[in-house]
Design a protein with these regions (language model features):
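Helix-loop-helix units of permease transmembrane domains in multi-pass membrane transporters
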Residues: 65-99
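Short, hydrophobic transmembrane alpha-helix segments
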Residues: 35-46
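Aromatic-anchored segments of alpha-helical transmembrane domains
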Residues: 28-36, 102-111, 156-167, 182-184
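Long, hydrophobic alpha-helical segments
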Residues: 46-70
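Terminal transmembrane helical anchor/hairpin motif
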Residues: 154-227
Length: 227
C-alpha cells in the first residue's frame, strides 16, 4: 500500500507539472462561462457540450498519457518478466487515470456548479457510465495494440462514434443531456424507473456493462501476453 501511494504521488506530480493540465484547468471553466453568457446554450446544452462531447476526448488523452509513461518504454517489457500480477499493473494505471480525470473534472465543475447551478453536477454524474465504457475501450485498444497509440486510436474512434453516430445508435446514443426527457430525469423532475424512462436506465447500464467487458478483455489480454 505504501508503494502504491508513492506511485500515485509521482504520477500526480508528473501530471500537475505539465503545461497541458494547468491550461485545461484554467480554460475549460472560462470557456464554459463565456459560452453560457453568450446566450447560445442552455444549461443542459452546455453540460452536454462539456461532459458528453469534450470531457470524453479529454479522458482519452489522460488514459493514453498514463499508459504511455510505462508501456511505450522498455520498462514495461522488463516488468512483465518479473513474477508480479500483470492485471494489477493494468488496473493501477487505470486507477491513476481515473484519479487524475475525476480530480480535474471536480475542480472544473466547482466554479461551473456555483455559477450555473446543480444541474452541472448532475449532468457530470449522469455521464460517468459513458466514461467507464470509453475507458475500458481505450485500455483494451492499448493492450491489443501493445502501445498507448493503440488505445488513443481506439478512444478517438469511440469518441467519433458517440459524437456523430447518434442516428445509428438510436436509444443507445451516449449524448442524451440535450433531450428534454433526459433533462427532466437528471434534474429530478422525473424518475429513472418510470416506464417512459426505462430506456434511459438501459442506456446507462449498457455503457457500464461495455466498460466492464472491455476491461476484463484487457486483463485477459495482458495475462495471455505475459504468460
Amino acid at each position: 500500500m505504501r508503494g502504491f501511494s508513492i506511485r500515485v504521488r509521482l504520477f500526480l506530480k508528473l501530471w500537475c507539472t505539465s503545461f497541458y493540465s494547468l491550461l485545461t484547468i484554467i480554460l475549460i471553466p472560462i470557456i464554459g462561462i463565456i459560452i453560457y453568457n453568450s446566450g447560445t446554450y442552455t444549461i443542459d446544452d452546455l453540460s452536454s457540450l462539456i461532459y458528453e462531447k469534450t470531457a470524453t476526448i479529454w479522458f482519452v488523452f489522460i488514459i493514453q498519457w498514463c499508459f504511455s509513461v510505462d508501456l511505450d518504454s522498455k520498462f514495461f517489457n522488463q516488468l512483465i518478466t518479473y513474477p508480479v500480477s500483470k492485471w494489477r499493473f493494468l488496473l493501477e494505471r487505470t486507477l491513476f487515470s481515473i484519479i487524475i480525470f475525476f480530480s480535474l473534472a471536480i475542480i472544473i465543475s466547482l466554479p461551473l456548479g456555483f455559477i450555473l447551478g446543480n444541474f452541472v453536477w448532475k449532468g457530470f454524474v449522469f455521464t460517468i457510465p459513458v466514461y467507464l465504457a470509453l475507458g475500458g475501450f481505450v485500455i483494451l485498444g492499448t493492450m491489443i495494440g501493445k502501445h498507448s497509440l493503440g488505445g488513443l486510436i481506439a478512444g478517438i474512434l469511440f469518441w467519433m462514434m458517440i459524437l456523430f453516430g447518434g442516428a445509428l445508435l438510436r436509444e443507445l446514443n451516449a449524448i442524451l443531456l440535450i433531450y428534454g426527457s433526459v433533462e427532466r430525469v437528471v434534474s429530478g423532475e422525473s424518475r429513472f424507473f418510470l416506464a417512459e424512462n426505462r430506456w434511459i436506465l438501459i442506456n446507462r447500464l449498457f455503457y457500464i456493462g461495455l466498460g466492464v467487458i472491455c476491461t476484463i478483455g484487457a486483463i485477459f489480454k495482458i495475462n495471455r501476453k505475459s504468460a
